[in-house]
C-alpha cells in the first residue's frame, strides 16, 4: 500500500513538472492569433543590414518557430533569425510566417542620399566618395530654393563624381549678376569632376544679366551629362546682356541624352563652348528662342576663327536624329557688324558618328543668324551652312 502511494506521488510530480514546462516552451498545438514586425518598411543602402523582430500572439509561440523568406534575394536576403541584408538596388518583400499567420516588410534598397534643403545638398556633395563608374547617388526630396545671399557657386563639385536625381523637383533662385564678386551660379565642376542630372528642372532668373555668369560651369576636363527629365530654362535677358545656361570649358564635355532640354527666352545662350569643348547629342534638344543662341559671338574661338586665326571651332557631335523642334543658332552679329574677314576653307560645326549619318533634316535645324534692328534674322549673305558627307560645315560665300 505504501509503495502504491509513492507511485501516485511520483506520477503527480511528473505531471506538474510537464505542465510548468509548457509555460516556457513552444506548444505546436497552440494556434497563432497574429504576428507583427518591428518594421513595415525599410530603406537600406547596398551592404547594409537591419534585424526584423517579430511579435507573436500568444507569446507562448516563440520566435524560433518563425520561417523567414524574401521574394527577391537579388535585392535583399533574410536569415533564419530575421537579419535583412541589402544586396542591390530595387525592392523586395520579406515575409515572416508563424504557422497560419504571416507579416511582411517592404525593403527598398537605394544607394541615393535623400536631400531636402540647400544645406543637405551641399553636405551630400562635399562628402561624396563615388567614382566615375559608380558615382555617388543623390535624390531631391522636394523643391530647393537657393537664396540670393548664397555663395558665389552655390554647389561646387571639386573632383567628385555625382549623379543627382531631381525626383521631378526644381532647383531655383535669384542670381544678382553684375560682373562683380557677388555674381552667383548654381553648379561649378572643377578638377576632373563629373555630374549627371536627371528628372530635374533648373530655372535661372535675375534682376541683371551678365555674360560673365552661367547656371552651370563645366571647367576644363570635367563632364556634365543631362539625362531624362532634365530641363534648364536660362531665363529672360535684360537689354543686350545674356545669361548663359551652361558654359563648357576646354577639353570639357557636355552630353545630352533622352529627353533632356535646354531653352531660353528672348536673349541668352543655352550653351557656351570653348574651342576644344565637346557637345555630344545622344538625345535631347536645344531650343534657341528669338535672339537666343546655342553659341554666340561671345565664344572667343568662333571670333578668332572668323578673324582668320588657326583655332578649333567647337564641334557638335550628333548621335541620334534630332527632335523636330530643335533649333541651334550660331550668332554672327559681331562679325557681320564689324565686317570681319573669314579665313579660306570651311569650319566643321556639326558631325555625325559611325552609327548615325546626318541628313538634310538635321541641317535644317542649324542656323547662322544675326541681330537686326527690331529683332533677329537668319544671316546668309556672307556665310552658309552645308552638308558635306557626315558633317555640317560653315563657309564664307
Task: Give the residues covered by each predicted segment.
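Extracellular beta-strand-rich solenoid/capping regions of secreted or surface-exposed proteins
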Residues: 146-163, 174-199, 203-224, 246-251
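Beta-strand-rich solenoid/repeat architectures in extracellular/passenger domains
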Residues: 169-183, 198-212, 224-242, 254, ...
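Extracytoplasmic soluble-region selector
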Residues: 21-112
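Acidic Gly/Asp/Thr-rich repetitive segments characteristic of extracellular carbohydrate-active
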Residues: 59, 112-141
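Extracellular/surface-exposed low-complexity segments
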Residues: 5, 122, 283-284, 298, ...
Amino acid at each position: 500500500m505504501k509503495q502504491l502511494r509513492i507511485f501516485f506521488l511520483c506520477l503527480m510530480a511528473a505531471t506538474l513538472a510537464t505542465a510548468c514546462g509548457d509555460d516556457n516552451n513552444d506548444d505546436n498545438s497552440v494556434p497563432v492569433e497574429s504576428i507583427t514586425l518591428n518594421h513595415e518598411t525599410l530603406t537600406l543602402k547596398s551592404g547594409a543590414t537591419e534585424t526584423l523582430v517579430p511579435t507573436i500572439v500568444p507569446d507562448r509561440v516563440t520566435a524560433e518557430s518563425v520561417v523567414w523568406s524574401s521574394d527577391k534575394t537579388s535585392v535583399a536576403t533574410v536569415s533564419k533569425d530575421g537579419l535583412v541584408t541589402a544586396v542591390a538596388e530595387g525592392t523586395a518583400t520579406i515575409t515572416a510566417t508563424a504557422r497560419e499567420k504571416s507579416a511582411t516588410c517592404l525593403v527598398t534598397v537605394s544607394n541615393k542620399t535623400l536631400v531636402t534643403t540647400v544645406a543637405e545638398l551641399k553636405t551630400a556633395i562635399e562628402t561624396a566618395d563615388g567614382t566615375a563608374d559608380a558615382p555617388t547617388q543623390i535624390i531631391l526630396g522636394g523643391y530647393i530654393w537657393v537664396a540670393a545671399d548664397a555663395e558665389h557657386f552655390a554647389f561646387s563639385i571639386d573632383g567628385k563624381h555625382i549623379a543627382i536625381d531631381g525626383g521631378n523637383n526644381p532647383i531655383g533662385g535669384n542670381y544678382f549678376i553684375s560682373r562683380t564678386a557677388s555674381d552667383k551660379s548654381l553648379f561649378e565642376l572643377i578638377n576632373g569632376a563629373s555630374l549627371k542630372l536627371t528628372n530635374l528642372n533648373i530655372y535661372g532668373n535675375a534682376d541683371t544679366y551678365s555674360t560673365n555668369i552661367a547656371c552651370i560651369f563645366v571647367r576644363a576636363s570635367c563632364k556634365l551629362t543631362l539625362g531624362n527629365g532634365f530641363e534648364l530654362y536660362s531665363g529672360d535677358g535684360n537689354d543686350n546682356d545674356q545669361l548663359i545656361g551652361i558654359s563648357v570649358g576646354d577639353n570639357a564635355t557636355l552630353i545630352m541624352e533622352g529627353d533632356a532640354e535646354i531653352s531660353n527666352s528672348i536673349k541668352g545662350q543655352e550653351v557656351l563652348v570653348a574651342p576644344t569643348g565637346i557637345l555630344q547629342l545622344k538625345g535631347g534638344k536645344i531650343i534657341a528662342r528669338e535672339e537666343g543662341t546655342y553659341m554666340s559671338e561671345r565664344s572667343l574661338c568662333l571670333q578668332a576663327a572668323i578673324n582668320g586665326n588657326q583655332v578649333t571651332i567647337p564641334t557638335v557631335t550628333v548621335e541620334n536624329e534630332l527632335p523636330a523642334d530643335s533649333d541651334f543658332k550660331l550668332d554672327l552679329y559681331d562679325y557681320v557688324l564689324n565686317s570681319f574677314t573669314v579665313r579660306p576653307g570651311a569650319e566643321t560645326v556639326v558631325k555625325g558618328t559611325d552609327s548615325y549619318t546626318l541628313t538634310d533634316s538635321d541641317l535644317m535645324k542649324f542656323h547662322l543668324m544675326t541681330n537686326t534692328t527690331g529683332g533677329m534674322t537668319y544671316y546668309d549673305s556672307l556665310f552658309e551652312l552645308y552638308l558635306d558627307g557626315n558633317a555640317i560645315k560653315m563657309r564664307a560665300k
